[in-house]
Amino acid sequence: LFSEHHLSHAASAFYPSPFQNAAILTLDGVGEWTTTSLAIAKGSDLKVVKEIHFPHSLGLLYSTFTYYTGFKVNSGEYKVMGLAPYGEPVYADIIREKLITVAEDGSFQLDMSYFDYATGLTMTNKKFDALFGGPPRTPETELTQREMDLAASVQKVIEDIILELVSVAKSGMN
């Protein structure tokens, strides 16, 4: 028996809950191919109604900034989250204007010309580096205000997008 990654997340959130109806939003790096999904649950019926597929991923966007700020992908994301309160979201507009496009329905696409994670050995490329003023921070070197501001910026952008997705999910329930 095999269950899709995002459907498993949705089921494990809904079925033990006290709710009879729910909108379930699942976001992560990537499941089999899905990175973001919206499921609607009514009674015992659970159906995924919307998906966004790899390489377009809020989780991988966050992991890209984890890499760029000098931390290890898939284990250092909490450090980026911890840095965010010490910075200002001065790069948020650049992220919104250059790296990600968000549609009215909450769906999004990354401009993959800035990223190498789908085809290369690193998360970013020279175009990404130029956008943020230089190469990634070397791991274990001193943190600067730039890393704190980058963390605050990606945190703000992703929080805003998630709020849009939640609004879409809520409207899908009505």
Residue ranges and their predicted role:
Residues L1-N174:
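Short acidic/glycine-rich loops and adjacent helix/strand connectors
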